[in-house]
């Protein structure tokens, strides 16, 4: 049973890609683009993102959407990327031979990419939205004429 301060648990699914051979900083840059977006829109953003990491993040997001659709029976059009984060994986250490017997260390960094999608309930129209939908008040021609006459 949820506690007093707990938010209601929404249905959703997650997908994790582990030991991805991309620098965590570069992957985080791509993940930050899609966090909070609707899932279908996030796929489109990733499809046209120029970063190399966007391909891996696209695969993880597509897997999370498929998990939600197949395991949780959720509508893929009603999904939102609620969480998306990148953790650092193990670093493979290599060396580059240099002149005069030296060797420089090369760090081949890996990361773990996690994407969580949740179903969102359709938002009820609020009072502010209904005010925007109301037509603007029209002024009568007589009222505008009297204002212009006084200005002359």
Swiss-Prot record:
Region (Disordered): 124-152
Record keywords: Ribonucleoprotein, Ribosomal protein, RNA-binding, rRNA-binding
Presence of the UniProt keyword Metal-binding in the record: no
Compositionally biased region (Low complexity): 124-143
Assigned GO CC terms: cytosolic large ribosomal subunit
Origin: domain of life: Bacteria
Disulfide bridge map: none
Family annotation (Pfam families): Ribosomal_L22
Coiled-coil blocks: none
Alphabetized PROSITE patterns for the sequence: RIBOSOMAL_L22
MF term (GO), any: structural constituent of ribosome
A GO biological-process term: translation
UniProt family annotation: Belongs to the universal ribosomal protein uL22 family.
Subunit field text: Part of the 50S ribosomal subunit.
HAMAP family cross-referenced by the UniProt entry: Ribosomal_uL22_B (MF_01331_B)
NCBIfam families cross-referenced by the UniProt entry: rplV_bact (TIGR01044)
Function statement: This protein binds specifically to 23S rRNA; its binding is stimulated by other ribosomal proteins, e.g. L4, L17, and L20. It is important during the early stages of 50S assembly. It makes multiple contacts with different domains of the 23S rRNA in the assembled 50S subunit and ribosome.
Protein name: Large ribosomal subunit protein uL22
Organism: Salinispora arenicola (strain CNS-205)
Gene: rplV
């Amino acid at each position: 049973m949820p506690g007093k301060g707990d938010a209601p648990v929404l249905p959703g699914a997650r997908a994790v890609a582990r030991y991805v051979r991309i620098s965590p900083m570069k992957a985080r840059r791509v993940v930050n683009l899609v966090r909070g977006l609707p899932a279908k829109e996030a796929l489109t953003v990733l499809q046209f993102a120029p970063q190399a990491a966007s391909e891996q993040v696209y695969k993880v997001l597509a897997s999370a959407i498929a998990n939600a659709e197949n395991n949780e029976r959720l509508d893929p059009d009603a999904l939102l990327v609620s969480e998306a984060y990148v953790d650092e994986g193990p670093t493979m250490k290599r060396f580059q031979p240099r002149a005069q017997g030296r060797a420089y260390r090369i760090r081949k960094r890996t990361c773990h990419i996690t994407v969580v999608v949740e179903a969102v309930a359709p938002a009820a129209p609020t009072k502010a939205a209904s005010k925007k939908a109301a037509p603007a008040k029209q002024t009568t021609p007589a009222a505008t004429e009297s204002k212009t006459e006084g200005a002359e």
